[in-house]
Regions:
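Exported/periplasmic ABC-transporter solute-binding proteins
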Residues: 20-53, 57-67, 74-77, 81-247
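Bacterial N-terminal signal peptides that target proteins for export
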Residues: 1-6
Length: 247
């Protein structure tokens, strides 16, 4: 009995020694999906992912200034590539983990029609977008308005959020009547679950390919490598699919 208890204690100590922690900077559009992935990762690996949500552009600046992030889940491909060229991400570690979708959304039923014709009506109220200078979903929103020939009509009605999470908050709270948000923020199992929305056709803007990268600070952290490997696996991919992402 004593030998069994000693063996169990040793096993638990070994597992504890192997378990680690990884600091993850995740694009704001990932919202609930990344929390589900982090929970599943902890359950399946024993490692803990500490997730910070924010705009990709601001994370880029923070990593340059020495922020202790070890993994970046960006909302674009350019930022991980730039970090790699700057020596701040591990060469060859980048991969596309998701393709985001944009949706024009209102928290109210019947405001946004299934074809987005509300945009062609005289502007009523504010239209929320993420800051296009730092947020890829904000750039996609501007590209969409431009491709529809409606950017000038809506320019004075735009309200810019710091990131896509804040853009969603503006609409959900009623501070903006409509807004361009990430499909992942308002969808469950392929359909908009609250309010009304128009899923923007993919040809209306450049693809929102979202890349992950192992940052230089995480190069020697087994938990960071394990998290990226988990992100490639079916458990994480299933969560992302359910959240409306393309893979």
């Amino acid at each position: 009995m004593l030998r069994a208890l000693l063996f169990l204690a040793g096993l638990l100590a070994a597992l504890g020694a192997r378990a680690g922690e990884v600091q993850v900077a995740a694009a704001a559009n990932l919202g609930p999906a990344i929390q589900k992935i982090a929970a599943a990762f902890a359950r399946d690996s024993g490692h803990r992912a500490v997730v910070a949500l924010g705009s990709t552009g601001r994370f880029h600046a923070q990593v340059r200034n020495g922020a202790p992030f070890e993994v970046l889940l960006a909302a674009d491909q350019e930022t991980p590539g730039q970090l790699e060229s700057e020596g701040l991400a591990v060469a060859g570690s980048r991969f596309t983990y998701a393709v985001g979708r944009l949706v024009l959304w209102s928290a109210q039923e019947g405001v946004v029609d299934p074809r987005g014709e509300v945009l062609r009506q005289p502007p009523a109220g504010k239209l929320a977008i993420a800051d296009p200078r730092v947020a890829p979903y904000g750039r996609a929103a501007v590209e969409t308005l431009r491709s529809l020939g409606l950017l000038a009509a809506w320019q004075s009605h735009l309200v810019q959020a710091e990131n896509i999470a804040q853009a969603h908050q503006f609409v959900a709270s009623g501070n903006a009547r409509i807004g361009f948000v990430a499909l992942s923020q308002v969808v469950e199992q392929g359909r908009v679950t609250r309010g009304s929305g128009w899923i923007v056709p993919e040809q209306a803007h450049a693809p929102i390919r979202q890349d992950a990268a192992l940052l230089a600070r995480g190069a020697n952290n087994p938990a960071a490598a394990a998290f990226l490997a988990y992100l490639r696996g079916e458990a994480a991919r299933s969560i992302l699919r359910d959240a409306g992402y393309g893979l």
